[in-house]
């Protein structure tokens, strides 16, 4: 049964999105785009989804919302994947919505789920686009995600930083999070908040506009769709 009105999940809160976290803080891993069935068909070990011998610590899935449950924990399913939302930033969703979810693989009482960080509503056109994106970016997952071994040691800080800087997806995620957090931002303000060369910032902004993630309500001003 669908919901007649959107459900509000949580209250607003700032998002901290530096390119590299300060010493002692946890690294923010790349959010790799995967199919929902890949989450369902693979193991979660040590808070990482194991795909083709790689440990994926942040995932991004697209699918249809069902079985929304609002209680002590807010949860719903996206094409069969259990998603749980603990953030305070408000999110409005209904049964049947197409949503784009970024989050971390977790398990509780033997059940796999995604601890959602960002949830965005999309439309049907995104399903075909996401299929193309996954095929295009899968090589990065296979080349750069952490290797899974039974007794694998943690990657060094230098390796984690190298992996994060190499992958443009994580930088675009940070740009999106900054814009989403402030609501509307000028190019100059954004350039101050994210420490990358201007030519790279212009390229990423152009790609985000082409993909429909952001738009310019006025020249040089950006908002999330």
From Swiss-Prot:
Domain PCI: 166-214
Pfam families: PCI
Superkingdom assignment: Archaea
Cysteine-cysteine disulfides: none
This protein's name: Uncharacterized protein MJ1654
Lineage: Archaea, Methanobacteriati, Methanobacteriota, Methanomada group, Methanococci
